[in-house]
Amino acid sequence: MSEIFVAGDIHGNYQGLMESLNAAGWQEGDTIICVGDVTDRGKDNARTVSFLQEHECDVRLVQGNHELQHKKLLQYYHVLIKVPQIRLFAAGIFRTYKAGYTYPKTKEELKEYECSADRRIEIIQGKPKTFHAFVRAFIAYTLAWEDDSLWKIILYLLEVMCGNPYDAERTIYEYLSCTRKQRAAFEWLWNQTATEVNIDYTEPYKYQHIVITHNNPFGRYYSYDLDELRPGHDKTLYIFGHIPHSEIVRFDRACSGCTYLDIDTSPNSVGVIKLSDYL
């Protein structure tokens, strides 16, 4: 009989995910339920989403705030990947971005990048290596001082997705530079819309209901169900993530038989539990 494993926020930590799954006893064919926030912050986002999609039949995904944000921005990603050279320069921008870097934010500042046709060709055919060189190449290729519509997308992503709170620059770089198959895996993840996974048991287990969500459905991690004494609310195991801790946080409600588990141990590790260990 296959087992069910629940993984906390992964944040692109493929190595941490595999180490925790293997330590918990996961085997091929077992079910993996992810509480959300699979990408961003870590360095192996494409590898992580590819692994999950390869096991699509055995994976259940809860939408986290990071997935929701990428889903909203997917229309802009699609614009950037249409032209190979634009995709290349855009990928370079997000690969080399560091907090505190400056870049043009107004039409007047873009005018400072205007150059002759010969200089434009020289910039485009060059081999940029730094953030500012990629910015200049993107602006030159798209003639952003005349039409800044594409640059506005870059600017928006830099302002919204890079640095706190999403730290998604590595993910955007990987999405723009990876294979079509890997991009399809990213989009498969971001288009998941389930906000909750429910499992009910009729066997005489300690818990009759399992509720898996991205964050504590009642507030912060020490919040609890005020209706916990009502039938159907008691004897419930709540599993969630979103707020990171150095280890899995558990608190029990003796009066109702409910237990709350925050399994987000990012960024240093990926919290994984085998559900049968708690039943």
Stretch-by-stretch model annotation:
Residues M1-F51, H55:
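N-terminal active-site segment of His-dependent metallophosphoesterases
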Residues H11-G12, D40, L68, P217, ...:
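Short, glycine/acidic-enriched loop or turn micro-motifs at the edges of active sites
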Residues G29-K43, L61-K72, T106-K107:
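Active-site neighborhood of divalent metal-dependent phosphoester/pyrophosphate hydrolases
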Residues R41-E54, K72-L80, V249-D252:
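Metal-dependent catalytic neighborhoods of phosphoester/phosphodiester hydrolases
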Residues L68, Q75-T106:
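Active-site phosphate-binding/coordination module
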Residues Y97-L261, T265-S269, Y278-L279:
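Acidic, His/Gly-enriched loop-helix segments that form or flank divalent-metal centers
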